Structure formats: structure tokens, C-alpha cells
């Protein structure tokens, strides 16, 4: 039986210019016919640069945006970014010396950076890496990730959502999901028809003394209208537990691809066991479907940069780079174009 969600994989050509090259643990966001890329690593836990790369879908060429305004001061890995309208927002990330970036926006019309929030201030969100970001028309959301830590405390994971109100420039933490909710990094995180979904991720046990650092297959959503969290049971072609996978929303579907399905004994320094499978979750029926494999990336990968995008009039999942089973990084640019949803 053919899946309900029909689409096709397209390897996007990159015809030159100065681009990000092979990397992982970076962030991308799409605005109009441009793709923006920031941060990342080529070797484990070593930053590369703090340039903002711009890909033009019309010419299929890369360039570097000139750093006008309050540009990022830290070369980041484990950073995330999202787009709202014509602005992109970056949050967190760190360099190899554990200097952490803050929260900034970049106006794609004026090509100017704006400093918005210093992280780790009292009453505001904490600095972090390997978190997840999502957005709607009025908010930027940050979920999970790994804390900064320090000389007196060990880095830990988060389980809460931080919400930034774009209109008034203020942060608020949404209701805590409670002790039965795993703290996670590298989770799927998406706004679908007004609800905020958390899908899978790399988890810390909810049982005192239990096993930490494992792949989760939990799926929950937060409803801003009722201010309540709900954990759901999904069915169908359910993917195995995983983290650091590419994902995007198209209609009522959360599309995911690849990711780490088993952690490496050397932690982030190794590749882990990676996937090259794609799935779509219908958030109304809670049924998973497996995506078609024709044209999909043949080599498994994780820690890709990802975003929802519209390319040639079709909505879908766009992803760049990632870590391969050889522990090398790739600079592939792939788009899963949805034909029907």
C-alpha cells in the first residue's frame, strides 16, 4: 500500500561560490528563495567559523553575508536557528573552549544582525547546545538541549520549553511537563496546527539511578490553549528510537529522516549507529508511514542541519551536511518535496 504522504527526494545542485562545505551540528533556515547556514563542526567538538552562509536557489550558488550590526561573536557548534517571516533567529551553541553564544536575530531584508537576549541571566533561558528550535507567527520556541555546566556543576539536559514573544521581546517558560517526561537533547521539535510536539531524542532516565544517555521513542505534545502536556502512543511503521535527525512540518505531518539510533561508546567523538530511513507522523491519526527510498541519501547520517522549506513551489524537508558512519562530514544538500499531504 502506497503511503498517504507522497513525495520525492531531490539532491540540490551546488554550483559554486563560497559555501559552508562539509560540516555537522550547524543550523539552517530558509526565507523565500534563500537558505541560510550558521555554525557547525568538521571534526568532533571543534568549531569552524562564525560566518553566515547564504544559498540562492535560483543560481544554486553560495555566498557569505557581510557581518553588519551585532553579529555573533562565538564560532558555534550545536547551534540552532529558525525563521519567522523575513528574520532568522539563532540561539545558543558553543565553541570548543565552551564559550557560549547568545540569542540574536538576522534581518534578511536589511542584512543586519540584532542582539536580543544574553543567556544565563536571572529569569531568562539558560545557554545550551544540541537543543531544538521551532516557531509560529508570534513566537520562537526552544526545547531541551545540554546546559553550559561549569567548574562546580556537570552539564545536564533540559525538559522544558522556553518561549520568546517576538512582539514584546520577552521570554517565558511554558509549564513543566513533569518528572515522567524525559530530559532530552537532539529531539524532534515542531509546531503543528497550534500544538507543540516533542518527538524522540537522546534522553536522561526519569528513574533515579536509571540508565542515562539512551535513544528515546517518546512522543508528546503541549497544547497552549489548555496549557497541558499529553503523551501519545503512535502506531504504524513506527521508527526505532533515535535522536539528532532532520525533521520538518508539512500540513499535519512531521517528516523525519536519518539520525542516530544507537550512541557511540566514545560519545560525540564517534559516529554512533546512524540511519538513512525517512518517516512521516500523521499528528491527527498518530500513525507513522515510511517514506519512499527512491532518490534518498544512500549513506546514513546524523547531526544534519534541517528546516522546512518551499522549493520550486513544493513544501518539504530541506537538510544540509551531517555526520557519516565514517565519522566524516558531508556537504550534501537534499530536499524531500511533498507532492500530496
Swiss-Prot record:
EC assignment: 4.8.1.5, 4.8.1.6
Result of changing residue 130 to A: Lost activity
Outcome of swapping residue 46 to A: Reduced activity. Strongly reduced activity. Reduced activity
Stimuli inducing this protein: By jasmonate.
Domain of life per record: Eukaryota
Keyword hit for Repeat: yes
Residues annotated as catalytic: 94, 157
Catalytic activity: a (Z)-N-(sulfonatooxy)alkenimidothioate = an epithionitrile + sulfate; a (Z)-N-(sulfonatooxy)alkanimidothioate = a nitrile + sulfur + sulfate; (Z)-(indol-3-yl)-N-(sulfonatooxy)methanimidothioate = (indol-3-yl)acetonitrile + sulfur + sulfate
Residues binding a (Z)-N-(sulfonatooxy)alkanimidothioate: 46, 94, 129-130, 157, 186, 211, 244, 303
Disordered: region residues: 1-24
Phenotype seen when the gene is deleted: Accelerated leaf senescence and increased pathogen damages.
Role: Specifier protein that contributes to constitutive and herbivore-induced simple nitrile formation. Converts glucosinolates both to epithionitriles and to simple nitriles in the presence of myrosinase. Promotes the formation of epithionitriles after hydrolysis of alkenylglucosinolates containing a terminal double bond. Mediates indol-3-ylacetonitrile (IACN) production from indol-3-ylmethylglucosinolate (glucobrassicin). Triggers the production of 3,4-epithiobutylnitrile from 2-propenylisothiocyanate, product of 2-propenylglucosinolate (sinigrin) catalysis by myrosinase.
Record-given protein name: N-(sulfonatooxy)alkenimidothioic acid sulfate-lyase (epithionitrile-forming)
Organism: Arabidopsis thaliana
Lineage: Eukaryota, Viridiplantae, Streptophyta, Embryophyta, Tracheophyta
Gene from which the chain derives: ESP
